[in-house]
């Protein structure tokens, strides 16, 4: 439990996206520090492929990829979760990179004044087949695959919207 300091992140991608993100946002809105991570319960709970839910961590330049360094990147918020087909890189608010240490030296926290305008930048990419997959696209969000970029396709294009949630 996050409120008892028993876990550092909430796992995702194995239940409907609206449920998972609702739990995560409520946890954050209650003032708890909690990251989000991808998971695949293969082969324990269901037999979907390994890597169904993925978490990507940015390591500092020149830092060796080790489990410890990767976990510290997740803890510090230098990460994002996806389905392996959609990516958000170099996300910044007013030049403050996700997972950086803020004025109070806490990783991933940037102070901003109430009503302050923020310039948000990021590199985003989505990998979609040329033709829509209507089998996935038309399923209710309560059916697998819960997180899949196909659900976001704009019309018959290979484009998806980028949404910034402001709280």
Predicted regions and their residues:
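Extended catalytic-interface subdomain
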Residues: 1, 14, 37-39
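Histidine/acidic residue-rich metal-binding segments in metalloenzymes
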Residues: 1-6, 19-35
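Glycine- and acidic
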Residues: 6-9, 145-147
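The substrate-binding groove and active-site-proximal loops of carbohydrate-active enzymes
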Residues: 8-18
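C-terminal functional module detector
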Residues: 25, 29-35, 40-167
């Amino acid at each position: 439990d996050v409120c008892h300091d028993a876990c550092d992140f909430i796992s995702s991608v194995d239940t409907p996206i609206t449920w998972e993100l609702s739990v995560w946002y409520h946890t954050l809105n209650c003032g708890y520090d909690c990251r989000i991570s991808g998971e695949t319960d293969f082969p324990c709970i269901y037999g979907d492929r390994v890597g169904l839910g993925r978490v990507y961590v940015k390591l500092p330049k020149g830092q060796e990829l080790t489990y410890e360094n990767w976990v510290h990147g997740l803890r510090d918020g230098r990460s994002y979760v996806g389905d392996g087909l959609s990516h958000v890189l170099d996300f910044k608010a007013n030049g403050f990179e996700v997972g950086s240490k803020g004025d109070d030296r806490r990783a991933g926290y940037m102070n901003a004044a109430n009503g302050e305008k923020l310039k948000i930048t990021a590199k985003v990419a989505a990998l979609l087949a040329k033709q829509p997959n209507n089998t996935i696209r038309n399923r209710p969000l309560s059916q697998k695959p819960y997180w899949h970029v196909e659900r976001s396709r704009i019309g018959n294009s290979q484009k998806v919207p980028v949404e910034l949630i402001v709280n």
